[in-house]
Amino acid sequence: MSKIKFKTKSALKKRIKVTGTGKVKHGHAYRSHLAQSKTTKQKRQSRKSTLMNNSDFKRLKKLI
């Protein structure tokens, strides 16, 4: 008998990307609306994707 293989969560699959070194990239939060109250610097910096923290990555491993 083989071990059960769990499916990857589809919602997560659409939101993250794993780099070649195994780190996880994701987009910034708080970008969809209410942007007029944020500074230009906040809006500009949130365009780029960022790497996930190690503490979050440990929780995320179960979903991948």
Swiss-Prot record:
PROSITE patterns: RIBOSOMAL_L35. Keywords: Ribonucleoprotein, Ribosomal protein. One of its GO terms (cellular component) is cytosolic large ribosomal subunit. Residues 22-64 are annotated as: Disordered. The keyword Cytoplasm does not apply. It comes from Mesomycoplasma hyopneumoniae (strain 7448) (Mycoplasma hyopneumoniae). Residues 22-31 have a biased composition (Basic residues). Pfam families: Ribosomal_L35p. Belongs to the bacterial ribosomal protein bL35 family. This is Large ribosomal subunit protein bL35. One of its GO terms (molecular function) is structural constituent of ribosome. Disulfide bonds: none annotated. GO terms for biological process: translation. The keyword Ribosomal protein applies.
